[in-house]
Amino acid sequence: MLSLAEAKEKILMALSARKLVERGWLTALLGYLAKREEVEVRLKYIGDLRLQRKDFGALAILTYYATMCQPGLPEELAKTFSRSLEPRRAFSLLLASLSLASYPCRKQSTDNKVSINMSPERLSLEVNGVSVAFNPSCVYIDSLLEIFAWGEYEVPEVLSGLRGRDVIDVGANAGDTALYFILNGARKVIAVEPLPNVARCAEENVRLSSATDKVKVINAALSYEPVGVPCDYDVRLSGSFSTLKGNGPCKVPGVTLGDLINMVDDPYLIKMDCEGCEAQVILGPEREKLRAFEHIILETHPFITGVSNEKLLASLKELGFECRPHRALDPKLGQNVYHCKSLSKEFSA
């Protein structure tokens, strides 16, 4: 049950989306607050849609943040995407674009110099002279939301020391996390993604971002041996694929943590969102190599691995890391994001 304060906040954010909803806004809002699974709306320019509750909530929140610095942007984007796309695809790109656009607005920094350019062919964002761009056919919408809108990797202590440092990104998907780290000053990112077509999307997005000198995409699995994966997995669903649960006819090489560390000069951060492989790294024979990093950001998946979060955190504590919860993604499943800081690195500095 929502508290009064939470309900007021959600209503305030939903008011921002009202300018996009031609019909059904109040009914959708009441359904959203009552936690109905689906709501029906007619969006300006786009048309009639049946939205999942989370999508209506995302539209409300993203519109709220985007209008802080560009009041007319949501309507402009809806109009642009409706010209050549069917309603569902237009809505998906609207959410993706608002995710990118809301990022600098949400940070509310007057020092940010921001340029936004969204079209059905290219989604691009430039902040303080650093740009990232995505092919709309090569994006996982939920991932963009998590990274740029919800701040899944927005750990101030990590970002404040990221400039000019190196990152290993395990579970890179379509390159969105790697490009997020570049946007925040990383010098080099090694991006590991096991699904071949998703890795190609990551390469495409890195190319569009003119970041091929900073991001190296590796189509491989974190493993001691080659792994079989699907050859053509739907990018829009790829965020939930796990090499521990799925397989396929395409063989991709295995890379070890040691291999990845040897690819960078300054292992500052390792990010792991690999649907279960984090347990293999933290409890496996190369676990001591994690000491090379100053920071770890990991997403846990006990429902896949059968390994409790407590066991993983205890292992990291033995390695000299202090771990704190950053985001609770699904409390029922124990799916959380943790930030772990090396205490030995802190004291040696």
What are these regions (language model features)?
Residues M1-A349:
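Phosphate/nucleotide-binding beta-alpha loop and adjacent structural elements of enzyme active sites
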